[in-house]
Amino acid sequence: MTLNKPVHSENMRFPDQPPSYQHLRAVQRQQQSAEPFKAGAFIDCGWGRVLMGHTFEKPQDIAEQLLHEPWGKRDIAMYVADPHVVLAAAPQTLFLDPSDSYRLDLEQKLVEPSAGARVSVKRLASLDQARAVNELYLKWDMVPTDPEYIWSQCASDQIVWLVAIDAESEAVIGTVMGINHMTLFNDPTRGSILWCLAAYPQARHHAVGELLVRHLAVQFLA
């Protein structure tokens, strides 16, 4: 899921079109005072890298990065305008994930004042919480992440882990990770993205995942 602050531009692409390198350049040109965005941007998430496909000028450059995926990791390219061209560079090695992505309007009311009275959502604050996050990944057969790495990123302005905590037991019952496009590559469209949403399967509270999504949106809206 991508989280975007509204940007009013005469040359915005259609809503069902993925962003592209050319689109970023067009938006940047309209914002004459804007600093250039960082080309070829990616970030290490512990379980692998997320490549910001629309910061790569050529599809072949995306393929080249993906072909260097370390063993035991999962590198993913997001915002790829021409995935068929990327796949053509290594059709026996690369594959297209059929998952959809959605955009969330950050102008709407995101968190009710009374929401989550029995569950608090906070930024990850300890190594023990990082271990709990990795345990949630394992419960859902997600690629595991070294808790030490998660904890080492606790003060990062590019990547954030939020945890949902049961107010009574103080156990971590959910987690979500987000990437800030602005601090990562100076995104002229002021975007951000949600990754790795997971909730404890036997949690006694409902809508833990939704609460995490809403709090992450507020985090990036601030």
Which stretches of residues belong to each language-model region?
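Conserved acetyl-CoA binding element of GNAT-fold acetyltransferases
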Residues: 40-57, 188-201
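A conserved beta-strand-loop-helix scaffold within acyl/acetyltransferase catalytic domains
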Residues: 141-198
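Short coil/turn motifs at secondary-structure junctions
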Residues: 107, 181-183, 202
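Acyl-donor-binding surface of acyltransferase catalytic domains
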Residues: 25-29, 47-118
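Short Lys/Arg-enriched alpha/beta "domain-start" segment
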Residues: 2-45, 61
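Conserved acetyl-CoA-binding loop-helix of GNAT-fold acetyltransferases
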Residues: 58-67, 195-199, 205-221
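Short amphipathic alpha-helix that is part of the acyltransferase structural core
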Residues: 5-6, 109-147
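Nucleotide-sugar-dependent glycosyltransferase donor-binding/catalytic pocket residues
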Residues: 126, 204-205
